[in-house]
């Protein structure tokens, strides 16, 4: 069982429950260049909430991306992930990329009007959530896990949302 410190947080440990092993990866040596796809997530695991965008600039391990805010929350503590573009949608005024978040590669620490910024190879403080769903009518039990990037304003909503999503599966 994972220990949580007195403030209710734990540092991200790149290990997962068996149900997460195929999707939960950490890449300590990730490299991004301007134009690369990048993701930002506030939850990661069996349930993920986040967005993807484009890297604007790289200075060593520091990156600037999106060119617009994610949630416009200032100082933040989110997962940075790599991302894979799987399709595009064209439009007359603007187009969109369809992408998936991938491996955890760092921490997003700024979410400002001009974009998001973060550091490769550092990781956010997180709150681990594990939900066990027992369906007596089907005679089966499933366990789901996720990590929520520590943010007091989102913690209750996201943990409740993860529990609800687990019940809905």
Where does each model-flagged region fall?
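Terminal presequence/propeptide segments associated with secretion/organelle targeting
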Residues: 1-169
